[in-house]
Curated annotation (Swiss-Prot):
InterPro entries: Cit_transptr-like_dom, NhaD-like. The keyword Transmembrane applies. It comes from the Bacteria. It is a multi-pass membrane protein. The gene is nhaD. One of its GO terms (cellular component) is plasma membrane. It comes from Alkalimonas amylolytica. NCBIfam families: NhaD_1. It is found in: Cell inner membrane. Na(+)/H(+) antiporter that extrudes sodium in exchange for external protons. Can also transport lithium. Has a low antiport activity that functions over a large range of sodium concentrations. GO terms for molecular function: antiporter activity. Belongs to the NhaD Na(+)/H(+) (TC 2.A.62) antiporter family. GO terms for biological process: sodium ion transport. Pfam families: CitMHS (PF03600). This is Na(+)/H(+) antiporter NhaD.
Length: 483
């Protein structure tokens, strides 16, 4: 009896939700922005995102709340439309958003697999060991890790780059909290800035490229604005770096077999994706998935030739009496592509799914249209894009960029590049504003903190504004100023 009362209560609640006059039967999407179900969906998304922002405190993966929120939002939407006997409209909208996610997810999965393969082959360890052996001063280390972050992130993505450079700093300056915090702030700014002028540097730039709004070569016009965004705060912070030499640490790292060839295959994969998109007008994910095939064939080659390679190396080590090398050879395991796939950042990919589906659902309800009218018609696009860059420091740049793409505002090419820049570098204003910042707070826990980053926010903001000014000046013709 109690369960029947619960069912009756739930049915009554659903009737209340779906009985407002706005739900008139129509083949077109309904405007639900003023309905109770619309407000409930907004509340669900807000609660989910508050939980995401509290990831560090709650020790809860950020994908969990948005996955549940996405399900609840689309279930509510589905109930609305099926009550009006037009379920096909909801199904088509859901499949459209799912397809957008699937293309981006597969693209990112291949990129992450290659990065994990290069990490397993010890390419990044070798780079770190080289920097450590050189015995650079703190000043040199500050600038080298910053510039390497800026130039590696367009290829290896800003998150991977930041983690690599932070590992170098933590190894060399072990225990020096002040210097580690300064370097981590510098690395986050540099990695985010470097990722802004490449479709492979950040998820947001990849989204813009996949949407066909910016060609791959056109991202390069953001190079100088991004460089300014990095250099201004770096120059100021460098005055606070002590001019002394850390103790030299020797670390010998030997590249595993095939490391450089996998790097070559990664570059070939990127080239394949670019050619598919630019010459054949096919989604870039086709080229990336083909590139995963390159890696699988090479993995097969490595496994088939492993016994012969080990025999040659073992014979050489025995002739030289190198017991350490013989010990290492005894622990060699075959290269496995699928183990690299399994090590992809699945929490990030699932978080991305949740965000895409949540924002897609809110857009289907009509809220993105309202936001577009408020931002891009109530304001001019330049002001709107600058504001959205600042907002991305608080609520992450992925939902911000996806919302803008879903709004499809009428903007010049220069304005699309502007939102690409601001969403990419705006996250540097706070440590929680980018994946790189959040990751380093975990990797350098106790050294790099929210407030340690926050005290540099004013000078970072100056770099943010300066980069926008440089873009508006250098790329003025893209804004149709002289039309």
């Amino acid at each position: 009896m109690q369960s029947l009362r619960c069912v009756s209560w739930l049915a009554g609640l659903l009737c209340l939700l779906f009985s407002t006059p706005v739900f008139a039967a129509s083949a077109a999407p309904l405007d639900l922005t003023s309905s109770l179900v619309g407000f409930v969906c907004i509340a669900i998304f807000v609660v989910a995102y508050v939980l995401v922002m509290g990831e560090e405190k709650l020790h809860m993966r950020k994908s969990k709340p948005v996955l549940v929120a996405a399900g609840l939002i689309w279930i509510l939407i589905g109930w609305v439309y099926i009550s009006r006997d037009i379920p096909d409209v909801t199904e088509a909208a859901f499949r459209h958003n799912l397809l957008e996610f699937a293309e981006l997810m597969l693209f990112l999965l291949v990129a992450m697999t290659y990065i994990n393969a290069l990490e397993e082959r010890r390419l990044f360890d070798a780079l770190r060991a080289w920097m450590i052996r050189k015995g650079f001063s703190y000043q040199n280390l500050f600038w080298i890790t910053g510039f390497l972050s800026f130039f590696i992130s367009p290829i290896a993505d800003n998150l991977t780059t930041a983690l690599l450079m932070c590992a170098v700093v933590m190894k060399v300056a072990e225990g020096d909290k002040r210097f580690i915090n300064l370097c981590c702030v510098n690395i986050v700014i540099a990695a985010n800035a470097g990722g802004a002028f490449s479709p492979f540097g950040d998820i947001t730039t990849l989204m813009v490229w996949q949407a066909g709004l910016v060609r791959i070569d056109e991202f390069l016009v953001l190079f100088f604005p991004a460089l300014v965004n990095y250099l201004i705060p770096a120059a100021v912070m460098s005055f606070f770096v002590e001019k002394r030499q850390p103790s030299a640490v020797y670390e010998d790292v030997e590249l595993k077999r095939g490391a450089l060839r996998i790097l070559t295959l990664f570059l070939l994969t990127v080239a394949t994706a670019v050619l598919c998109h630019s010459l054949l007008h096919l989604p870039p994910v086709l080229g990336m998935m083909m590139g995963l095939g390159y890696l699988q064939f090479f993995g097969y080659f490595l496994r088939m030739t492993l016994p012969g390679s080990l025999a040659r190396k073992r014979a050489m080590a025995e002739r030289e009496g190198d017991q350490e090398k013989l010990k290492r050879l005894g622990g060699v395991v075959p290269f496995d592509v699928f183990s690299r796939v399994s090590r992809a950042e699945w929490d990030t990919l699932l978080f991305f799914y949740g965000i895409v589906m949540c924002v897609g659902g809110l857009g289907f309800l009509g809220y993105l249209g309202l936001m577009s009218d408020l931002l891009y018609e109530g304001w001019n696009p330049t002001s709107a894009n600058i504001l959205l860059g600042v907002i991305s420091a608080v609520i992450d740049n992925i939902p911000v960029m996806f919302a803008v793409l879903a709004m499809q505002p009428e903007m010049s090419h220069g304005h699309w590049l502007l939102i690409t820049l601001t969403a990419g570098v705006g996250g540097s204003l706070l440590s929680i504003g980018s994946a790189a910042g959040v990751a380093l707070m975990g990797q350098a826990r106790g050294y790099y903190t929210f407030f340690g980053h926050l005290k540099w926010a004013p000078v970072i903001f100056i770099g943010y504004i300066a980069s926008i000014a440089v873009h508006l000046w250098l790329n003025a013709d893209l804004f149709h100023i002289y039309d």
